[in-house]
């Protein structure tokens, strides 16, 4: 056992328990997520049979009405979130023997981190969209304003970002840091984050590489602050503004405020996977990673 400083707190590094706890948590994670997503699907089916929404799980990705698709997907994602939070509460209480808030939920002094995360996601997608327009990779078609769909998507991505960040950064990375140095911990947790998206539609090696890099990007602040609000805000903003600017998100085609035509699917524009499946996204993430590392390193000092 050795000791290290994170911020102003002294933490114990256990070379065995941390990494083992992190890796073994993957199995119950998939069990809980599958079980609770099943509840979400069941509720959506009930609403479908009662004619409240048009939902048939066998044709889930073929739902013609975008509103119904978003309602069903939002329901499923919030059940997913409940499952993740319940699992982590159990693990923190009975395995880690720590308060649940130690995952990184303290809001004290973190408003600026939330603003920074939301702003960076917007800037990343706005600049990426503009560059692709100027390069002739995509062609603007028009706007498709629908406030209810925008609200549903924002709520949906809140659930997605909290669930994924709380598990991957709040639990997996937190435990890995008890066993390994920050670089190794970031690499392992980011590989897990990337592989969680392995079965997404239209995924390819460029997309998985970018998701790995994004995992490091999202984890840098946690290494220095042990707080989740910046990665949650950046993850939320990244997903939300990606679809607002017309891109698919992690291979999923959904409602977009801006509509454009992809001239030709390639690794410059990301094709059917979305902007995060592009070389441009990788470049932006690497640049942002460097500046965030400098920023939070200075913050920690």
At which residue positions do the language-model features occur?
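Membrane-interface helix/loop boundary segments of multi-pass membrane proteins
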Residues: 163-188, 220-227
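Hydrophobic core of alpha-helical transmembrane segments in multi-pass integral membrane proteins
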Residues: 28-34, 81-91, 122-128, 281-296
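C-terminal membrane module of polytopic membrane proteins
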Residues: 45, 240-301
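Juxtamembrane helix-loop-helix connectors linking adjacent transmembrane helices
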Residues: 42-75, 96-166, 173-178
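Small-polar-interrupted transmembrane alpha-helices in polytopic inner-membrane proteins
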Residues: 125-128, 157-161, 182-198, 212
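Single conserved hydrophobic/aromatic residue that forms the stacking wall/gate
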Residues: 1-12
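Hydrophobic alpha-helical transmembrane segments
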Residues: 68-83, 159-163, 266-286
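Functionally important transmembrane alpha-helices
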Residues: 35, 207-266
């Amino acid at each position: 056992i050795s000791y290290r400083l994170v911020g102003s707190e002294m933490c114990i590094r256990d070379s065995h328990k941390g990494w083992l706890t992190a890796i073994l948590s993957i199995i119950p994670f998939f069990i809980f997520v599958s079980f609770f997503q099943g509840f979400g699907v069941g509720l959506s089916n009930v609403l479908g049979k009662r004619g409240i929404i048009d939902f048939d799980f066998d044709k889930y990705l073929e739902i013609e009405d975008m509103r119904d698709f978003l309602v069903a997907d939002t329901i499923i994602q919030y059940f997913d979130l409940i499952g993740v939070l319940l699992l982590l509460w159990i693990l923190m209480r009975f395995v880690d023997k720590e308060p649940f808030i130690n995952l990184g939920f303290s809001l004290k002094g973190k408003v600026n981190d939330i603003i920074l995360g939301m702003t960076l996601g917007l800037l990343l997608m706005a600049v990426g969209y503009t560059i692709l327009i100027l390069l002739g990779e995509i062609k603007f078609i028009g706007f498709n304003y629908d406030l209810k769909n925008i609200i549903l998507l924002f709520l949906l991505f809140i659930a997605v970002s909290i669930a994924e960040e709380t598990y991957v950064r709040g639990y997996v990375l937190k435990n890995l840091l008890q066993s390994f140095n920050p670089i190794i911990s970031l690499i392992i947790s980011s590989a897990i984050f990337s592989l969680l998206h392995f079965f997404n539609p239209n995924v390819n090696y460029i997309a998985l590489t970018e998701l790995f890099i994004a995992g490091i990007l999202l984890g840098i602040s946690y290494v220095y602050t042990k707080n989740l609000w910046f990665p949650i805000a950046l993850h939320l903003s990244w997903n939300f503004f990606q679809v607002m600017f017309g891109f698919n998100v992690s291979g999923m085609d959904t409602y977009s405020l801006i509509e454009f035509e992809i001239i030709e699917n390639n690794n410059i524009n990301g094709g059917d996977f979305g902007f995060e499946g592009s070389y441009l996204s990788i470049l932006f993430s690497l640049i942002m990673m460097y500046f965030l590392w400098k920023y939070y390193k200075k913050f920690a000092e």
